[in-house]
Every structure is written in C-alpha cells, then in structure tokens.
Amino acid sequence: IAKYDDLKQGKSDVNPFVILKCPWCGAQMGVVSRKKGTKEVPGYEKIMGPKRQKKIVFRCRNIANDCAFSKKDYVLPLYVIDESIYDVKPTLLLGTVDKFAMLPFRPEAQGLFGYSNGTKITAPDLIIQDELHLISGPLGSMVGHYETMINELCTLSVHDKQIYPKIIASTATISRAKEQCHALYGCPKEKVFQFPPSGLSAG
C-alpha cells in the first residue's frame, strides 16, 4: 500500500506492481505522469479487503468500456504480492529461482503445493521452465536442490503409485538435453523427449 501511495504522489519511480497493459484488451495500465509531479496509476486500485485490510487490485481502464474487466464488479485475476499469492493460490504461477529459496522460510507457501490445514489436495501438475540452458554449472547445482524439493511437493501418491509433474523446458541449445534434465530434475534419461528431434548430421 505504501509503495502504491509513493507512486501516486510521485515519490518513487519504481513500479513493483509489474502490470503495464490489460492482458485482455491491451489498454494502458501503470504509471502516467501528470503536472505538479503527481502521477496517475490507471488500472491499479486500492480497496478494502474482506478482512478489513487494504489491498491493491487490477481493474482495466478501457476508455470505450468494452473490456470485460473494465466493469465495476470485475477485477483482473492477477496477483503480484507474495501475501496475496499465498492467500489466493492462483491456477497459474510465475516465479524465479530466488522464490524457491524462500520456501523454507514461508510456511504459508505450502498451500501452493496442495497442503491445506494438514490435508493434501491436488498439487501443480505442470512445470514450465524457460531458459534451461542458463541453469548449468554452479547455478545448476544450486537450483537442482530446489527442483528436487519442488518435484517432491508436486508429486501425487495414488494407491501406492507416484504421479510426477510433467516438466516442459525451453532452451537455446539442445546439446546434452537428456543429461542436463537428468542432473537437474532427477528424471530418467529415457523419460526425456526432445522436440524438435535432432536432425541429420552432416560433414
């Protein structure tokens, strides 16, 4: 809330709320400079939450009012603050490795993996990893520890059968893909499928 107020009052140029356009219609959101140093932040609203706590929500400010999320009773289902993410448990979650490192220190994060009030519900079943080629060497060794933890938290046990999450990774290079995935995720090499497959060797 304090960072939102700082944005509106022109006290800060740093926008921690990330969202710059409505993902539905493309209308501008975020900081817009005005006269006398003040700033408008269309699309960001400060409201009172159900627990009488102020929170920031995202509502499209489409001038034509033809966006589904510009209506008074609708807000965009986007959450960029950690506390909101832990509370809402969104269907799609974007994160970086440094957030993995915080998991042992945030007990409330267990809800993201299906643990709620001591019971286990369905955990995330699809992990998409971007820039796989960057996770190698010393960084890969460190990330591998957290990936093992994430895989375990996302594994579902049904009738003594382990159902592991599917992992899709994109990379700029496909050399030694099976070896890297085996080292990073602990998956058997025969379970790694490369697309597109290797072509013909020439020369």
Feature locations, PLM:
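SF2 helicase catalytic motif II
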Residues: D98, M102, G111-L156
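Short secondary-structure boundary/capping segments
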Residues: P107-L112, M142-Y146, H182-E190
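Interdomain hinge/linker at the junction between the two RecA-like core domains of SF2 helicases
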Residues: A177-G203
